[in-house]
């Protein structure tokens, strides 16, 4: 919608939306579109599409299926964000940047694999230290070269844990890459991204150090799967986490629903 063809932007419709909000005395949390890449981008640069554990590259459609390590996708998202910031940096309705959307998932492409191996080398320095930490000698899984290390092997718990830590770091790196042009051009406009409570494999405490405001999505399910009091306790626990990560300052509930949702059934 914003970039129907490479390097051709269409902001007219968004101009109308932003202007209407300003006329009504309202403010906008403007989101960047990185969570769902356009079809032309996937077709021209197939390397931006994620690769799953068994080596298959994801299809072009859907969302949250881009490679966080892809130099092409990082460059394209930064370019888009720069264009957005240039256009709306002085707009009276712009109050906050909502960067991306619900960062999640992992990619097992060659770029991510090589980056993972570099990440491990930085952490452990030597293969001897890595093998000892992972107890790789068990079942004869000793690594003798960094290039031998895969991104997925459920038989090695240490590898699995480090892969999750690496993926968390890649998401943070991607987030910072997105925020760079926004902070350069609109230094007085805060940046946030929507957390997902206690999302598995994500260290939001580390993420919080890079954000100006903490925000979260919360979808209590009003059905028979769980008693209301249990959902209330779970929601309050997540609210407390957000308050803790924000240092006691206000945080934002970016997404919520008062009723059931189709994807929750």
Q: How would you name each of these model-derived features?
A:
Residues 1-3, 199-200, 260-263:
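Short, solvent-exposed loop/turn segments at secondary-structure junctions
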Residues 1, 30-34, 99-101, 193-195, ...:
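A cross-domain feature marking catalytic cores of carbohydrate-active enzymes
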Residues 1-59, 81-85, 172-186:
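Aromatic-lined substrate-binding rim segments of carbohydrate-active enzymes
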Residues 219-222, 228-265:
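Carbohydrate-binding surfaces of carbohydrate-active enzymes
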Residues 16-25, 85-92, 204-209, 242-248:
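Acidic (Asp/Glu)-rich catalytic clusters
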Residues 42-44, 54-224, 228-237:
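Polysaccharide-binding and catalytic clefts of secreted carbohydrate-active enzymes
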């Amino acid at each position: 919608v914003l970039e129907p063809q490479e390097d051709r932007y269409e902001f007219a419709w968004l101009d109308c939306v932003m202007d209407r909000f300003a006329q009504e005395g309202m403010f906008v949390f403007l989101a960047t579109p990185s969570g769902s890449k356009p079809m032309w981008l996937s077709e021209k640069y197939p390397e931006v599409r994620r690769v799953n554990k068994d080596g298959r590259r994801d299809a072009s459609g859907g969302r949250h299926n881009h490679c966080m390590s892809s130099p092409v996708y990082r460059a394209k998202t930064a370019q888009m964000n720069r264009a957005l910031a240039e256009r709306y940096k002085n707009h009276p309705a712009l109050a906050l940047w909502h960067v991306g959307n619900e960062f999640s998932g992992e990619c097992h492409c060659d770029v991510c694999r090589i980056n993972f191996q570099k990440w491990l080398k930085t952490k452990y320095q030597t293969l001897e230290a890595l093998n000892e930490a992972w107890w790789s000698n068990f079942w004869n899984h000793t690594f003798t070269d960094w290039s031998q290390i895969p991104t997925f092997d459920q038989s090695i718990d240490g590898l699995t844990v480090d892969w999750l830590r690496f993926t968390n770091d890649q998401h943070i790196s991607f987030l910072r890459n997105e925020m760079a042009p926004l902070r350069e051009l609109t230094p007085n406009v805060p940046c946030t991204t929507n957390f997902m409570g206690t999302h598995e494999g994500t260290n939001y405490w580390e993420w919080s150090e890079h954000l100006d405001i903490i925000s979260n999505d919360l979808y209590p399910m009003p059905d028979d799967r769980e008693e209301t009091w249990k959902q209330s306790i779970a929601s309050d626990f997540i609210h407390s986490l957000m308050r803790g990560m924000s240092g006691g300052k206000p945080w934002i509930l970016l997404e919520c629903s008062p009723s059931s949702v189709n994807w929750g059934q």
